[in-house]
């Protein structure tokens, strides 16, 4: 998800998105550990998405 799209969301929606992304990352890590994950690039993408969401959340909290 792009940062511009994330900035349009409110803090509650960002929190929900963060929870979904963390859950997806957990599932991907489990699949990777059991050698069932074919698209290993998704791990990196989801990690970066989580970082983007957290960054936008922090920006919004500081803005007020």
UniProtKB/Swiss-Prot annotation:
Q: Which residues form a coiled coil?
A: none
Keywords recorded for this protein, A-Z: Ribonucleoprotein, Ribosomal protein
Asked whether the UniProt record includes Acyltransferase among its keywords, one would answer no
Q: Name one GO biological process term.
A: translation
Q: What is this protein called?
A: Large ribosomal subunit protein uL29
InterPro entries referenced in this protein's UniProt entry, alphabetically: Ribosomal_protein_uL29 (IPR050063), Ribosomal_uL29 (IPR001854), Ribosomal_uL29_CS (IPR018254), Ribosomal_uL29_sf (IPR036049)
One Gene Ontology CC term in the entry: cytosolic large ribosomal subunit
Q: Does the keyword Transcription regulation apply?
A: no
Pfam families found in the cross-reference section: Ribosomal_L29 (PF00831)
Q: What is the lineage of its organism?
A: Bacteria, Pseudomonadati, Thermodesulfobacteriota, Desulfovibrionia, Desulfovibrionales
Which GO MF term does the entry hold, naming one?
structural constituent of ribosome
Q: Which CDD domains match?
A: Ribosomal_L29_HIP
Family membership noted in the UniProt record: Belongs to the universal ribosomal protein uL29 family.
PROSITE patterns linked: RIBOSOMAL_L29 (PS00579)
Please indicate which superkingdom the organism of origin belongs to: Bacteria
